[in-house]
Amino acid sequence: MDALVRELMPYVGRVCGAIALDRGDDAMQETFISVLRNLRTLREPAALHGWVRRIAVREAIRVARSGREDPTDPTTLVGLTSVAPIDMATVIDVRTTLAGLAPEQRAILVLRDVDGLSEAEAAQLLGVAAGTVKSRLHRARSAFARRWEP
């Protein structure tokens, strides 16, 4: 079990952090509780990552909805790393902009623009129609662009 959690933790942490923001750790913990409780119900081991992604997104949205968002504390971002070197001020600006969006908008941006899921894949994961994903993505991108002040 420890190896499984270690393997999944970076991805789950990234998804939960992007959607639940400062409550990302809570969402990650809830995700792993749900995964460990329900692992026996997973019929197809090859589907593990998709199954965990679905749980992580849903838990992150639930946690984000359940609590008031606190302003992003820049000191919580110090340990962040990325593939491409980026300015910490930009990271803070992006997180602050994301904090102004609804959890569902953050989720669709993460799934489509960060994870690169297709409309159909995102729709299946979120349990909505592909057209709904398309309209939500448009609204989320528009809302992000309106709030973005680099």
Residue map of PLM features:
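A short, charge-rich alpha-helical start-of-domain segment used by transcription regulators
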Residues: 1-14, 21, 36
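Helix-turn-helix DNA-binding module
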Residues: 99, 103, 107, 115-132, ...
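Acidic, proline/glycine-rich intrinsically disordered inter-domain spacer in sigma factors
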Residues: 67-99
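Short helix-capping/turn signature of helix-turn-helix
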Residues: 7-10, 18-19, 110-118
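Residues within the DNA-recognition helix of helix-turn-helix
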Residues: 8, 136-139, 143
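C-terminal edge and immediately downstream basic/flexible tail or linker adjoining helix-turn-helix-like DNA-binding
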Residues: 78, 93, 124-125, 142-150
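Short, small-hydrophobic-rich alpha-helical interface motif
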Residues: 12, 16, 24-35, 122, ...
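Arg/Lys-rich amphipathic alpha helix in sigma70-family domain 2
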Residues: 37-44, 54-74, 87
